[in-house]
Amino acid sequence: MKARLLFLFLFTFSFINTVKGQDLITFKTYDELNTYIKENNSKPLVINFWATWCAPCVKELPYFEKLNQENQNVKVILVSLDFEKQVESKLIPFLKKKKIASTSIYLADKDYNSWLPKIDKNWSGSIPATVIFNQDKKIFVEQDFSNYEELNTFVNQSITK
């Protein structure tokens, strides 16, 4: 029994890295991410797909951080699509340096053709991309936001529809 508990503990925490008091959660498959989304939807979710190598993504991250701090009506989740071998060398140091407080997830599932259509059937796969889950509604945009006001307006309009 002790061995099973130890295995379960080690298995569970082997996918978590600490980032500024916030955990970087790693999901190996989209299905794991989808389960997490379903279990954490007590309020509207604003999910941004991004990567450290994507300049427009990095530019708009402060807007999502501000949204996370100022809009208590939503939960912001940042889903990194960085390259797996750069998680330790680039992603985690980036999150620490920028003091990212939003929920941060690394999605290791590289079978994009299987899960992109589950987010939105028209998603080409380019990032940044944002999806809002609000109860049974889903609103997807494949664009970057020019400023915080544009993002905040989009989110507020989306959650009141």
Task: Report the location of each language-model feature.
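Alpha/beta-hydrolase fold active-site loops
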Residues: P44-L45, P128
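Conserved redox-active cysteine motifs that mediate thiol-disulfide chemistry
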Residues: F49-Y63
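A short beta-strand-turn-helix
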Residues: L24-P44
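Structural microenvironment flanking redox-active thiols in thiol-disulfide oxidoreductases
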Residues: L61-K98, Y112-W115
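Hydrophobic beta-strand anchors of alpha/beta hydrolase catalytic cores
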Residues: V46-I47, V76
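Short, internal strand/loop/helix patches
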Residues: L95-I127
